[in-house]
Every structure is written in C-alpha cells, then in structure tokens.
C-alpha cells in the first residue's frame, strides 16, 4: 500500500513547465563544476510552451541509460538547445564558478532562437545581456527546461570524459567522469 501511495504522489509531483508565463524562457544548467578533471559543460534549452514530459528530472536522479534516452527526446522536441564548454585551461585562469557562468553564456549565445528570459539552476547567475533571469536553487528538480538543460550538459560532458578515458585509461574517467572518488582519496 505504501509503495502504491508513493508512486501516486510521485506521479503528480511533476516539474513546472515555465517560471515566466508570458516570455520565451531558456533553462540553463551546468555539469562538471565539482570535478577534478575536464571541461565544464552547460546547456541552454527552450521548450515549447505546451511541453510536458513527466520523465524529465534532475540528471543526477536518472540512470545513465535514461539520461541518454531523454537527451534524444529533448534534442528532438526542444524549440532550441545548445551546449557551451569551458576548457580546463580557461577554468584555471578564471576559476570554476566564473567558468560555469561562461559556459552558460556560451550555450545561450549558441541558441538559434533568442530567449526573452533565463532560468538557471543554482543560487546566482551573471546577467546575460539585458534579459531578465532567475536563479532557482534545485531548479533542475523544479522546472522542465532546467531539467532538460541538466540532462544535456551531463550527457555531453559524460561523452567527453569517456573520450578522454580512451586516451588516458589509467584515470578511470569512463566510470568516475572526473569527479573525486574514494579511490582518488586513497591514492
């Protein structure tokens, strides 16, 4: 009985379609900010006004397989999407927080549709031109466009780390994706 009730509650605990009701909004999120290695990736996603995909969620809550399935759906269904990247060399020069914002700005720059507003996962953001923006703590678990951006940023970064793992197999990046692990702490 309890499991059934939890499933029903979860079924109706869907992400919100939009923060700004009358503006074309882009959701943004990053992946790689807490990593020891690799670039930081960010995605910007504009979803259709009437879009509803109950499977969308924070990428960290989804399996690798499910993230990749949703990635294909997002890329197909989105009005516009783009990914921005900041290299390790740039991160070393400007710091990881500024690099995260720069990656988001690069993703927004690459959109083929200009948003009228931006919503971002987190507690702060560097303004993007004159667009209104809102930073939303745990936004990837609250708004569909941020969740979609979370999924794209994570999957594109994972692909990049798997490519690095093929070139540098001794770091185990295909499994840890550059994040610190117990193995790192023991090493």
State the predicted function of each range.
Residues 4-187:
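RNase H-like, Mg2+-dependent phosphodiesterase core
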């Amino acid at each position: 009985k309890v499991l059934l009730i939890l499933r029903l509650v979860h079924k109706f605990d869907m992400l919100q379609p939009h923060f700004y009701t009358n503006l074309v909004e882009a959701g943004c999120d990053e992946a790689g900010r807490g990593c020891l290695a690799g670039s930081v990736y960010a995605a910007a996603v504009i979803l259709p006004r009437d879009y509803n995909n109950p499977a969308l969620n924070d990428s960290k809550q989804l399996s690798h397989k499910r993230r990749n399935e949703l990635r294909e759906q997002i890329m197909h269904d989105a009005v516009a999407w783009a990914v921005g990247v900041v290299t390790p060399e740039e991160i070393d020069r400007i710091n990881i927080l500024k690099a995260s914002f720069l990656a988001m700005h690069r993703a927004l720059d690459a959109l083929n549709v200009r948003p009228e507003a931006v919503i971002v996962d987190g507690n702060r953001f560097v303004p993007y031109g004159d667009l209104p923006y809102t930073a939303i703590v745990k936004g990837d678990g609250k708004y569909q466009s941020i969740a979609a951006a979370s999924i794209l940023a994570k999957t594109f970064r994972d692909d990049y780390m798997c490519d690095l793992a093929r070139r540098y197999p001794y770091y185990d990046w295909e499994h840890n994706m550059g994040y610190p692990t117990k193995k790192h702490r023991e090493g």
